[in-house]
Amino acid sequence: MSQPLRFALNRMVAPRLSLPAFIELAVTLKADAIEIRNDLAGVEIEDGTPPQQVRQLCAAHGIQVLSINALYPFDVWNDERRAQALKLAAYARDCGARGLVMCPLNDRADARSEASRGAGLRTALTELAPILREHGILGFIEPLGFEECSLRRKRTAVEAIRATGGLDVFRLVHDTFHHHLAGEQEFFPELTGLVHISGVEDREAPLASIRDGHRVLVGEGDILGNAAQIEALLERGYSGHLSFEPFADSVHGLADIQRAIGASIDHLKQALA
């Protein structure tokens, strides 16, 4: 490994901590960036924390805000989505975030054809691009590998970005969990703005049955191939952050989350040495 790994903490890794405690956790772990979310009750940003407060707390500790997670479902464009996008883009700008994560519709009841889904994606990107430009932030598109998702693969997103002239404001989120679930083989390091990492250790569960609740910290028992995915991205030129995003309650309930994340960091450093 020719370059040091750059780690970040997604708010999902420790959703029960206060914002100051979460920032302190990042500092202690020598992670110089965080991601905040709009889907966690009781913490920022759902608790009404002003964006300026987030900016000030992070700046005081040398922490960068990578993103807000997430605009959903970004690829179903309507007046409600526009209002959500404007609100989140303003918050991202004001808190100093680099960008806004955008997740596609994940609904088994979505009866749209592939052509209709593709048209919806291109419409959304066309509408979102000027909003992102106006607010000076990036849009991080995160395909979800679940079978029912309207945008499963990064190749589809890349083609839509290029077709709509959005290369200046759109980047991909390479999520190691969703990359594995989608059975993807392609990597797009030149368009990857952020990497989400989490592990799965349940070897018995059928692939199609694996959900967010299976996602733990990356360790020896990981079946997603996190180290191999990260190595492939780094070898192809990716130099951005690796952001921990485990959803499992077993992680959220850990008595010593700092030690657990530290062990995962050490594991990845050793695996990628």
Where are these regions (language model features)?
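Active-site acidic/histidine proton-transfer and metal-coordination neighborhood
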Residues: P20-E24, L57-A60, V76-L172, D256
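Active-site beta-loop-alpha junctions enriched in small/polar residues
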Residues: N10-A14, R37-A41, A70-P73, L105-D107, ...
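Residue-level recognition of alpha-helix initiation/capping sites
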Residues: R16-L17, G48-T49, A83, T123, ...
